[in-house]
């Protein structure tokens, strides 16, 4: 019995917006649905990389086109030595790398105003590609992402938690949606999967963060009601568990900073620091103001201008 046969049930993905579907891992058994809805991109949340690797090799042949699968898996014991996992990781990282480079090529600009020249196709068909982007070049994709674009070219397995998890999830959504828009195939779609679909608090909070990013004037309760209006969420899933998922509140503040305070794509609100490299497991540290670490320079005493003295002048005596 194959992995897909073991997972088989009646779960059908639900639609979040024009290009995003979501559901449980069982959705992968409905290959007819996936093909009919032209699912090209898969984002898996909190699923075993080993499980996804097995499923990938079973479903890949059922698609007439290449699919890209990424996995947000915080398991520190990913069996990368497994041939299936290694093949899954290698092939999808290459595709993701190729996709990002192609989007940069389509944007057509670098620091010198010259088009970026893509490498010959044979360079990236069956191997990792090391792209040399000028460090000071800024593409359209750079402006759309909250994180560092280069981090998404290095792997298709993202071991992140907390706020970094929300950032990686939404940056991947942005990359895939931008690819759909630039590729001219507006029928392509994204499928977001978790173990139990709409009964997973983590998945619901991630979907809410996407709604908030697309609608920054929404508050968190409006986002929750929107997701509830399109998803079948059982009563056992409590609102407070969704709203208080670790990192969700911090990511809401990051959305406001980027999308409202300084406008969409503004560089002012972006974190171009090590926080933009969550793949290397660098957790964002909350910076707290520590008065003991602030060096205070002694300010010079302001000299009083005699012409601006507030003291009442003495009248001259005429003796």
Curated annotation (Swiss-Prot):
Keyword Repeat in annotation = no
Q: Which GO terms describe its cellular component?
A: cytoplasm; nucleus
Location in the cell: Cytoplasm; Nucleus
Q: What's the chief localization of this chain?
A: cytoplasm
Q: Where is the composition biased (Polar residues)?
A: 299-308
User: Any extra remark in the record?
Assistant: Present with 1360 molecules/cell in log phase SD medium.
Protein name, UniProt field: Uncharacterized protein YOR342C
Q: What species does this protein belong to?
A: Saccharomyces cerevisiae (strain ATCC 204508 / S288c)
Task: State the taxonomy lineage.
Answer: Eukaryota, Fungi, Dikarya, Ascomycota, Saccharomycotina
